[in-house]
Regions:
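Structural signature of tandem alpha-helical TPR/SEL1-like repeats
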Residues: 59-67, 90-100, 125-138
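Canonical positions in the second alpha-helix
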Residues: 71-72, 103-104, 141-142
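Short helix-capping/linker turns of helical repeat alpha-solenoids
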Residues: 33, 40-41, 45, 54-56, ...
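N-terminal leader/linker segments that initiate helical-solenoid repeat arrays
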Residues: 5-59, 63
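Alpha-helix N-cap/N′ positions at the starts of helices
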Residues: 37-44, 48, 64, 80, ...
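Hydrophobic face of amphipathic alpha-helices that form TPR/SEL1-like repeat modules
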Residues: 47-54, 83-90, 113-123, 151-160
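Short, charge-rich amphipathic alpha-helical segments embedded
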Residues: 71-79, 83
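Gram-negative bacterial Sec-dependent N-terminal signal peptides
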Residues: 1-3
Length: 163
């Protein structure tokens, strides 16, 4: 009797919609993403990282922020690279900050020059003024175009006399 019940339960589980859903999602997870899917995933990860960075709807958690920003950056998200660079400067890892900022710039995010200026200033290289100007211009353009992710950084730039 117990064997029959076990067989019925096993058959029900195999035929259940949940068992088909999990295997289908496993298959689709392995499938390559289209450029649009990649962009949407990168945006979602960036927003999640930004949320953890600034505590918009979640408790601030820099470790999780960096995790999600890094995942977005790995998908080619230039804004995520900027904020990773900023976090690396704050943690004192100037080499990593430079790599992130350079990658952001390569992807077209000229705000990365603002980070390069901060690095230059900390390393006493003396070329920070032009970088700050270019970075500030990019920050201001981003905010003027409606990207409020950069408004806090722009505010600090104004506060410290960069703009």
């Amino acid at each position: 009797m117990i064997d029959i019940i076990a067989l019925l339960i096993a058959t029900a589980v195999i035929d259940s919609p949940l068992s088909h859903t999990s295997s289908a999602s496993t298959i689709s997870a392995a499938a390559p993403m289209t450029p649009e899917q990649r962009l949407e995933k990168a945006k979602a990860l960036y927003e999640k990282g930004f949320d953890y960075e600034y505590g918009i709807t979640k408790t601030v958690d820099r470790t999780l922020a960096d995790k999600f920003l890094k995942e977005a950056a790995d998908l080619g998200h230039a804004d995520a690279l900027f904020f990773l660079a900023m976090n690396a400067v704050e943690s004192g890892d100037l080499e990593q900050a430079r790599a992130y900022a350079d990658s952001a710039i390569e992807l077209g995010n000229m705000a990365g020059k603002y980070i390069l200026a901060e690095i230059s200033e900390q390393e006493y290289l003396g070329d920070s003024e032009e970088l700050y100007k270019a970075g500030f211009k990019a920050l201001k353009e981003k905010v003027e175009q409606g990207d409020l992710h950069y408004s806090n950084v722009l505010g600090y730039a104004y506060r410290f006399g960069i703009g």
